Amino acid sequence: MEGEVSRKHPIDGVVPSEVQRFVLDRIDSIAQLEAILMMRNAPDTWWPSCTLAERLYIADRTCRSELDGLCQKGLVVAREEDIGWSYRYAPSNGELREFVDRLVYYYSHHLVPISNLIHGKPRTRIHEFADAFTLKKKDGK
């Protein structure tokens, strides 16, 4: 089952299953997690996507896509400004805020298991949809 927390995963016993579930449901990449960490440390700041992109060492276009994903999952909000899109940490409810706080704690104490959990996630439907438009040679490769 997609997004299911494995009972035999090395992260078990280190990170609570509900935090694992939050990661699987809400965090699609290390870039998203690192963006949340930065924005959470200055929650009243509107961060231009170009600034976050620079700090995350990713392209601005990629950064906007990652941040838009966080908006859809209720973790940040966005607004259009003269300089482009800006984002601010603003979980849509207290439960999400609490889960982010817990994730920050476990990520700071168990970086590798959390990173492995994120990297081990099944590909998202968006990636699968994008792959459908990848040009292929006549032999299908």
Each language-model region and where it sits:
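Long, charge-rich, low-complexity intrinsically disordered regions
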Residues: 2-12, 82, 88-92, 131, ...
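Short alpha-helical segments that sit at the start of domains
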Residues: 5-34
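Short helix-capping/hinge SLiMs at alpha-helix to coil transitions
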Residues: 25-29, 40-45
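Short, cationic-aromatic polyanion-contact patches
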Residues: 26-28, 80-103
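A short acidic, leucine-rich amphipathic alpha-helix
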Residues: 35, 48-55
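Short amphipathic alpha-helical interaction segments
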Residues: 57-73
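A short, conserved structural fragment
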Residues: 71-83
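Exposed, interaction-prone assembly regions rather than primary DNA-binding/catalytic cores
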Residues: 108-141
